[in-house]
Regions:
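N-terminal catalytic cores of peptidoglycan-degrading enzymes
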Residues: 1-87, 149
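Basic/polar, cationic surfaces and motifs that engage anionic cell-wall
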Residues: 1-9, 14-23, 96-166
Length: 166
Protein backbone atom coordinates (compact mmCIF):
# COMPACT_ATOMS: atom_id res chain seq x y z
CA UNK A 1 0.00 0.00 0.00
CA UNK A 2 1.66 3.21 -1.20
CA UNK A 3 0.93 6.21 1.01
CA UNK A 4 1.95 9.67 -0.17
CA UNK A 5 2.85 11.82 2.83
CA UNK A 6 1.85 15.42 2.12
CA UNK A 7 1.45 17.00 5.55
CA UNK A 8 -0.41 20.16 6.47
CA UNK A 9 2.21 22.64 7.74
CA UNK A 10 2.65 22.70 11.52
CA UNK A 11 1.11 25.61 13.38
CA UNK A 12 -1.95 26.03 11.17
CA UNK A 13 -5.45 26.02 12.64
CA UNK A 14 -6.29 22.82 10.77
CA UNK A 15 -3.29 21.05 12.31
CA UNK A 16 -3.84 21.36 16.07
CA UNK A 17 -0.70 19.39 16.97
CA UNK A 18 -2.28 17.77 20.02
CA UNK A 19 -1.43 14.13 20.82
CA UNK A 20 -3.76 11.39 19.57
CA UNK A 21 -3.64 8.04 21.45
CA UNK A 22 -5.10 6.32 18.33
CA UNK A 23 -7.87 4.20 19.86
CA UNK A 24 -10.31 4.43 16.92
CA UNK A 25 -10.44 4.86 13.16
CA UNK A 26 -13.25 7.05 11.85
CA UNK A 27 -14.53 6.54 8.31
CA UNK A 28 -15.93 9.43 6.27
CA UNK A 29 -16.98 10.15 2.69
CA UNK A 30 -15.78 13.49 1.36
CA UNK A 31 -19.23 14.69 0.33
CA UNK A 32 -17.66 15.96 -2.90
CA UNK A 33 -18.85 14.18 -6.06
CA UNK A 34 -17.26 16.70 -8.46
CA UNK A 35 -15.12 15.34 -11.28
CA UNK A 36 -11.46 15.43 -10.32
CA UNK A 37 -12.18 15.57 -6.56
CA UNK A 38 -9.89 12.66 -5.75
CA UNK A 39 -7.25 12.24 -3.07
CA UNK A 40 -4.75 14.55 -4.77
CA UNK A 41 -7.33 17.35 -5.02
CA UNK A 42 -8.25 16.96 -1.34
CA UNK A 43 -4.56 17.00 -0.42
CA UNK A 44 -4.16 20.29 -2.28
CA UNK A 45 -7.25 21.72 -0.56
CA UNK A 46 -6.28 20.81 3.01
CA UNK A 47 -2.79 22.29 2.54
CA UNK A 48 -4.03 25.36 0.66
CA UNK A 49 -4.89 28.85 1.84
CA UNK A 50 -8.65 28.18 1.77
CA UNK A 51 -8.33 25.59 4.56
CA UNK A 52 -5.53 27.23 6.57
CA UNK A 53 -7.85 28.88 9.09
CA UNK A 54 -10.69 26.36 9.02
CA UNK A 55 -10.93 24.00 12.00
CA UNK A 56 -11.37 20.95 9.78
CA UNK A 57 -8.78 18.29 9.02
CA UNK A 58 -8.31 14.57 8.60
CA UNK A 59 -5.43 12.13 8.38
CA UNK A 60 -5.98 10.38 5.02
CA UNK A 61 -7.71 10.97 1.69
CA UNK A 62 -8.30 7.76 -0.26
CA UNK A 63 -9.46 7.31 -3.85
CA UNK A 64 -9.37 4.47 -6.36
CA UNK A 65 -5.63 4.82 -7.01
CA UNK A 66 -4.03 7.00 -4.31
CA UNK A 67 -3.76 7.44 -0.57
CA UNK A 68 -2.55 10.80 0.73
CA UNK A 69 -1.63 11.33 4.37
CA UNK A 70 -2.15 14.88 5.66
CA UNK A 71 -1.33 14.58 9.37
CA UNK A 72 0.81 12.22 11.45
CA UNK A 73 -1.39 9.48 12.90
CA UNK A 74 -0.41 10.45 16.45
CA UNK A 75 -1.78 13.99 16.07
CA UNK A 76 -5.38 15.07 16.61
CA UNK A 77 -7.50 16.12 13.62
CA UNK A 78 -10.73 18.16 13.54
CA UNK A 79 -13.09 15.76 11.73
CA UNK A 80 -15.69 14.18 14.00
CA UNK A 81 -17.87 17.15 15.02
CA UNK A 82 -17.47 16.24 18.69
CA UNK A 83 -15.17 19.05 19.87
CA UNK A 84 -12.55 17.61 22.20
CA UNK A 85 -14.41 14.29 22.41
CA UNK A 86 -12.94 10.92 21.45
CA UNK A 87 -13.89 11.21 17.78
CA UNK A 88 -11.48 14.08 17.26
CA UNK A 89 -9.00 13.42 20.05
CA UNK A 90 -8.62 9.61 19.89
CA UNK A 91 -9.22 8.57 16.29
CA UNK A 92 -7.50 8.48 12.93
CA UNK A 93 -9.70 9.97 10.20
CA UNK A 94 -10.01 8.41 6.74
CA UNK A 95 -11.90 10.32 4.03
CA UNK A 96 -13.08 8.18 1.11
CA UNK A 97 -13.31 10.20 -2.10
CA UNK A 98 -16.60 9.89 -3.96
CA UNK A 99 -15.83 11.89 -7.10
CA UNK A 100 -17.96 10.95 -10.11
CA UNK A 101 -14.95 10.07 -12.28
CA UNK A 102 -13.60 7.51 -9.80
CA UNK A 103 -14.27 3.85 -9.06
CA UNK A 104 -16.12 4.05 -5.72
CA UNK A 105 -15.79 0.31 -5.08
CA UNK A 106 -12.01 0.46 -5.46
CA UNK A 107 -11.76 3.63 -3.34
CA UNK A 108 -13.85 2.05 -0.58
CA UNK A 109 -11.82 -1.17 -0.68
CA UNK A 110 -8.61 0.89 -0.52
CA UNK A 111 -9.97 2.61 2.60
CA UNK A 112 -10.85 -0.76 4.15
CA UNK A 113 -7.31 -1.96 3.44
CA UNK A 114 -5.83 1.19 4.97
CA UNK A 115 -8.04 0.85 8.06
CA UNK A 116 -6.91 -2.78 8.49
CA UNK A 117 -3.27 -1.77 8.12
CA UNK A 118 -3.66 0.94 10.77
CA UNK A 119 -5.46 -1.50 13.09
CA UNK A 120 -2.50 -3.88 12.83
CA UNK A 121 0.11 -1.15 13.19
CA UNK A 122 -1.40 0.40 16.33
CA UNK A 123 -3.25 -2.53 17.92
CA UNK A 124 -6.66 -0.97 17.28
CA UNK A 125 -9.48 -3.55 17.42
CA UNK A 126 -11.45 -3.82 14.16
CA UNK A 127 -14.57 -3.12 16.27
CA UNK A 128 -13.12 0.37 16.83
CA UNK A 129 -13.38 1.22 13.13
CA UNK A 130 -16.45 3.46 13.26
CA UNK A 131 -18.57 5.74 11.11
CA UNK A 132 -18.43 9.52 11.52
CA UNK A 133 -22.10 9.13 12.46
CA UNK A 134 -20.97 7.29 15.61
CA UNK A 135 -19.56 10.54 17.03
CA UNK A 136 -22.23 12.89 15.67
CA UNK A 137 -25.52 11.07 14.96
CA UNK A 138 -26.99 14.03 13.05
CA UNK A 139 -24.30 13.62 10.38
CA UNK A 140 -25.10 11.21 7.54
CA UNK A 141 -21.48 10.20 7.10
CA UNK A 142 -20.02 8.17 5.53
CA UNK A 143 -22.93 8.98 3.24
CA UNK A 144 -22.18 6.57 0.42
CA UNK A 145 -21.64 3.57 2.70
CA UNK A 146 -24.74 4.49 4.74
CA UNK A 147 -26.68 4.42 1.44
CA UNK A 148 -25.21 1.00 0.56
CA UNK A 149 -22.90 2.37 -2.12
CA UNK A 150 -20.84 0.45 -3.09
CA UNK A 151 -21.82 -1.67 -0.08
CA UNK A 152 -23.19 -1.13 3.42
CA UNK A 153 -21.41 -0.70 6.76
CA UNK A 154 -21.57 -4.40 7.66
CA UNK A 155 -19.82 -5.32 4.43
CA UNK A 156 -17.27 -2.53 4.93
CA UNK A 157 -16.38 -3.78 8.43
CA UNK A 158 -16.20 -7.31 6.99
CA UNK A 159 -13.74 -6.09 4.34
CA UNK A 160 -11.61 -4.46 7.05
CA UNK A 161 -11.57 -7.78 8.92
CA UNK A 162 -10.66 -9.69 5.73
CA UNK A 163 -7.74 -7.37 5.07
CA UNK A 164 -6.73 -7.54 8.75
CA UNK A 165 -6.67 -11.35 8.72
CA UNK A 166 -5.20 -11.66 5.23
Amino acid sequence: MNIIQDFVPAGRRNRPGKPNPMKYITIHNTGNASKGAGAKAHAAYIKGDAAANVPASWHYSVDDSNIYQHLPDNETAWHATDGNGPGNSQSIAIEICMNSDSDLLKATDNAAGLAASLCKKYGIPVENVVQHNEWYPKKNCPQMIREGKPYDWGVFRGRVLQFFQG
